[in-house]
Amino acid sequence: MKTVNSISGGKTSAYIAANYPADYNVFALVRTNDKNCMFPDKKIRQEVSDKLGNEFIGTLEMDTIIYTMLDLEQYIGKKIDWVTGKPFDEIILRNGKKYLPNVTQRFCTSEMKLQPLFDWWKKEINEVVEMRIGFRANEQSRAKNMLAKTNE
């Protein structure tokens, strides 16, 4: 069975990628088309665009996550597949209104992290895999809720 490490850019998933080799390492990036959030380094912006196969203007995550992922790829010595869904700006527009994520509607995780990961899996592998997702110990209830939603 093939293994996939889902990497968020955080410490837990970076630890998993560095210490638990997998057939694939995948990073789902939350993008924005807001020019006010433009990533400052033009060369890196182009490199990320090339990795995603989509124009990368900026991210709503900390800019350091981009450098962390590029460094992690070198550290583990294995390619990290970068995936992305619709930009945040498009997702929050629903029925002509802005719809922001909140405690009960955590669509950022499902639509901007998990869905692009599942889309990548279907295109690249499309068979049963062992998927490793890094949740911290204090996120157990969140992990259980996420698992329940993905099994629906």
What function would you assign to each model-found segment?
Residues 1-152:
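ATP-dependent adenylation/nucleotidyltransferase module used to activate substrates
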